Amino acid sequence: MQIFVKTLTGKTITLEVESSDTIDNVKAKIQDKEGIPPDQQRLIFAGKQLEDGRTLSDYNIQKESTLHLVLRLRGG
């Protein structure tokens, strides 16, 4: 199924995923497309931050859902 990931810059990334994919998997796909390391990614859906070990179906994320990607930058 397709889901969308919207970044803070307003860019929308389209990902091909399965309901059984973990949030880890999704972050890895985002890394493939955007080059953003998973440890800097925070994914938000319906106002909740998504935890790495959970699956998309745990959060009731269905096809064409939009997730929001927030970057967690290391404090310098």
Curated annotation (Swiss-Prot):
There is a cross-link at G76 (Glycyl lysine isopeptide (Gly-Lys) (interchain with K-? in acceptor proteins)). GO terms for cellular component: cytoplasm; nucleus. There is a cross-link at K6, K11, K27, K29, K33, K48, K63 (Glycyl lysine isopeptide (Lys-Gly) (interchain with G-Cter in ubiquitin)). PROSITE patterns: UBIQUITIN_1, UBIQUITIN_2. It is found in: Cytoplasm; Nucleus. InterPro entries: Ubiquitin-like_dom, Ubiquitin-like_domsf, Ubiquitin_CS, Ubiquitin_dom, Ubiquitin_ubiquitin-like. Residues 1-76 form the Ubiquitin-like domain. Keywords: Cytoplasm, Isopeptide bond, Nucleus, Ubl conjugation. Belongs to the ubiquitin family. This is Ubiquitin. It comes from Coprinellus congregatus (Inky cap fungus).
